């Protein structure tokens, strides 16, 4: 049996743009992708704290150190500049893989600069 658990999260980002004319996706500062382990074109779930919207799209890299978090395409209608969002990916794990499971959470400031990277390597030790 496989279980679906959080793999990575970028917490409390600030939307810096919304481009309805782009093909789709969410642009994320390359530094945040690197620190979280989220890959370009990986499926992500985005939660908008301002309006409660939850949606799925895919990540594309924005220039490193740019602070860019930008909704593209149809997703651009689901948030406005200044909204705070959470970006998450999930993975499927077997019972054996769960023994080494470690989700990564990147906490950012209001300019989308990483403040802290948390790895919860003992999360399932009590399960």
Swiss-Prot record:
Protein's GO biological process: alanine biosynthetic process; pantothenate biosynthetic process
Positions contributing to substrate binding: 57, 73-75
Pfam families: Asp_decarbox
The EC number(s) this enzyme carries: 4.1.1.11
Enzyme class, broadest EC rank: lyase
PTM summary: Is synthesized initially as an inactive proenzyme, which is activated by self-cleavage at a specific serine bond to produce a beta-subunit with a hydroxyl group at its C-terminus and an alpha-subunit with a pyruvoyl group at its N-terminus.
Keywords assigned by UniProt, alphabetized: Autocatalytic cleavage, Cytoplasm, Decarboxylase, Lyase, Pantothenate biosynthesis, Pyruvate, Schiff base, Zymogen
Annotated active site: 25, 58
Signal peptide: none
Pathway: Cofactor biosynthesis; (R)-pantothenate biosynthesis; beta-alanine from L-aspartate: step 1/1
Co-factor note (free text): Binds 1 pyruvoyl group covalently per subunit.
SS bond partners: none
Domain of life: Bacteria
Location in or out of the cell: Cytoplasm
Modified residues (Pyruvic acid (Ser)): 25
UniProt-listed InterPro entries: Asp_de-COase-like_dom_sf, Asp_decarbox
GO cellular component: cytosol
HAMAP family: PanD
Its biological purpose: Catalyzes the pyruvoyl-dependent decarboxylation of aspartate to produce beta-alanine.
Family that this chain belongs to: Belongs to the PanD family.
Name of protein: Aspartate 1-decarboxylase
Organism: Nostoc sp. (strain PCC 7120 / SAG 25.82 / UTEX 2576)
Organism lineage: Bacteria, Bacillati, Cyanobacteriota, Cyanophyceae, Nostocales
Designated gene of the protein: panD
């Amino acid at each position: 049996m496989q279980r679906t658990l959080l793999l990575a999260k970028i917490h409390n980002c600030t939307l810096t743009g919304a481009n309805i004319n782009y093909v789709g996706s969410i642009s994320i500062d390359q530094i945040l992708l690197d620190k979280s382990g989220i890959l370009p074109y990986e499926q992500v779930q985005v939660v908008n704290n301002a309006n409660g919207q939850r949606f799925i799209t895919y990540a594309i890299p924005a220039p490193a150190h740019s602070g860019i978090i930008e909704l593209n395409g149809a997703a651009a209608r689901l948030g406005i500049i200044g909204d705070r969002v959470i970006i998450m990916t999930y993975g499927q794990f077997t019972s054996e893989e769960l023994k080494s499971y470690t989700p990564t959470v990147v906490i950012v400031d209001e300019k989308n600069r990483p403040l802290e990277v948390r790895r919860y390597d003992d999360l399932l030790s009590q399960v």
